[in-house]
């Protein structure tokens, strides 16, 4: 079975290594691969796995066939609105660093379709399940915003202050999901609380960016910081914000 992976970065190749181990024929497409034509990579694919940076998704979607099942592994998407024209899409997300997946360390993720679980499950890679595609995508984006604030506050893992922060941030994410036609319970899955715990500390790029901001207000990173992109989209009104979210209010006030 051929599976096309769009995005040959660390996470895309980590997922590809699992699929190859399970006997799938993998074909990658990446903007850096000038020799590859997207149409050739997608030809005869039974599934497409989307692993490109979130900012690239709107530019790529018009060229992806709408009738091939699409597995969204990109994080940083605030809603699933851009996928409304696709006949069959599902989401894979959660607290998994690519290096840990490649090393076959124990990793737990969230899937929104049994086919994702069937394709990717290994003894070292396990899943919980929800059919809340929008909620899973939102969790994968919002946790990056809160990780920036954790870095700005200098919170250290496993301290009482860190636990309090993660608990409050997760409650706020649940409220945001409920206010945007998603399931608040999704925040309690691996894609929610699990990924939040992983991201609110080093070596998370979002957390690291927050530590820099604490000393250099307005600092603009050279590399993509998904939490900063998401925060700017939130400030533009791309999702509904209920009242009573002090942590989100604080971090948005600190970001340009």
What does each model-found stretch correspond to?
Residues 1-47:
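NAD(P)+-binding Rossmann beta1-loop-alpha1 motif at the extreme N-terminus of oxidoreductases
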Residues 4, 26, 137, 178-256:
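NAD(P)-dependent Rossmann-like dehydrogenase/reductase catalytic/cofactor-binding core
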Residues 12-15, 42-106, 116:
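Rossmann-like NAD(P)(H) cofactor-binding subdomain of soluble oxidoreductases
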Residues 72, 88-93, 127-131, 188, ...:
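General beta-strand structural signal in soluble alpha/beta enzymes
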Residues 75-77, 93-97, 113, 131-135, ...:
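Glycine-rich beta-alpha junction loops
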